Amino acid sequence: MKRLLFVSFFLMFIFLFTDSVYALSAAEVSSRNSECPVIELASANSDGSLVKVGCYDNYEQAKNIMNTTDNDNLVIVQDGKIVDAKYALIDYDQYTSLGYTNIYSDISLSNTLTYISGSYSDDAALIEVDYNSGRCKIKVGGVVGWIKKYENEANKTNVLYDIVPISWTTSPNYYQVTDDSIIHHFYKNVYLPIDKKYSSITIGRKPSMLNPGNYYSYDGNYFYSDLKTLLIDYKNGNYNNSVNSNNPFYNYYQYLSFRSQTNYNADNINQYLGARTTSNSKLYNTGKAFIDAQNYYGVNAILMLAIGINESGYGNSSISQTKNNLFGINAVDASPGQSATSFNSVSDCINDFAFKYLSGRFLQPGDFRYFGANLGNKYQGLTVKYASDAYWGEKAAHYYYDIDEYFGFQDYNYYSTAVLNSDYNNTVYAKKDPNGYNVSSKYYQYRKKGSAIIILDEVKGPSVNGNTTWYKVTSDPTIDGNMEYYDDNTYYSTTPRINYLWSKYVYVPAVYFTKITNGGGKINENLVIIPTPTPTPDPSPSPSPTPAPTPSPTPN
């Protein structure tokens, strides 16, 4: 009896005070005998058991009782499977034929927003379930959208997610704020034992609006002390009950425009890489290549390096070693090693990445990959179309943080930065000057909330919504001396390659942006510009409908 009491108290301690997720596996839930002929309403107890509450003739009856009863642990069960829950997360599957799961804008699945893979982290907030189709509305990595229940809906094969009621979760992915930093803790599978935490990364310096402690968030901007409150807000489409509802967090490294310059030089980069790698690494001694690419193509060297470290495992992955490919370029999830692009040299890879993939695509308004000029998340930024990892932007930001910490944070908050304060369409155009015309006949505009700019000056201009302040900012696209940006044919065929003009700026109305830092740093317009050789012509520079370059799941 004493042994049983000890075990009981030990298990209670685990459930209440550990950073883990416990639940019945999908197989265990499915093998449970059905308690009702059609629909069962059950209570999901914290020990992983399901206790019948009542039987119903249809889903709608059970749903109504579930939503109007005080019991927060209620779930709807059919044929031994949980098909809905009052408050729950989902565990999305990592084993699909494509290697990822699409997220769609609406239940009709007519428009793909982005894509995710459970190979990295597999829990998301469950907002809504459509019983008839099995499709569900979720939030993960900042994006809200719908996913399918089955990879093949016609045959109902390959289930893409399981519903995990929050009574079975004690700590899914969560953020830890310390006295000096913010850390993201990941679990790769919500059913793993408590000692199987996948990874933890420091993504930035301590957010000023958050006290030390543990928090939940599926966007990295608004944080919650408990999952129930988070889910209530998500279901209501707001952040009213988050701990920072009036002051969202924008991690400097995730929301720094690529059209910026680092304060570090080639020697600094080589010093850092010398401390983190060996001479066998493909990143070893690449400082000059990164700085030259920054100066010529207008892309922050440390942001590029951070992506390279994340994608190549510090230059030691098989793709980087055999193909000189530091950035996972074309390493699609289904066949990363086979599909990844080969380069003649590491410097060729760095130059192609800056010129073709960043300046030519991800930073080019009008390209289907353009969602803003920063790392961002699955809602906004490069992360939307670059990678299937919902937290790819945070992981790249982690390496920028590591580099910056190594040298005493000389880049952190250097610039005055701001983010677009809402979604806009055909509203926020970049101007040649506050009183002038839009930049380019192609109408370069900012659309997605969170799109980042660096503010180089504040000037007065025409009043917009009662505000006469305009921001002078660096341009997302590469523009020419006439403030036009290039068509694909001109951009890719010109020799030597077209360089970014650091002395050309654009202007945007301040009323549409929220300032997040006040660093006041300036752009060096007199950088040494070294024309870089053209490795190989781009055989198909125009955007294709295929998925964007996708990093390999883990460094090989």
List each language-model region with its residue ranges.
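Acidic glycine-/aspartate-rich tracts in secreted/extracellular proteins
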Residues: V459, S475-I479
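Ser/Thr/Gly/Pro-rich low-complexity, disordered linker/stalk segments of secreted
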Residues: G519-N556
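Catalytic cores of secreted/periplasmic lytic hydrolases that degrade extracellular macromolecules
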Residues: Y22-L303, Y314-S451, P462-T468, G481, ...
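Surface-exposed, glycine- and small/polar-enriched segments that build interaction surfaces at terminal
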Residues: I455-D457
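Pyridoxal 5′-phosphate
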Residues: E311
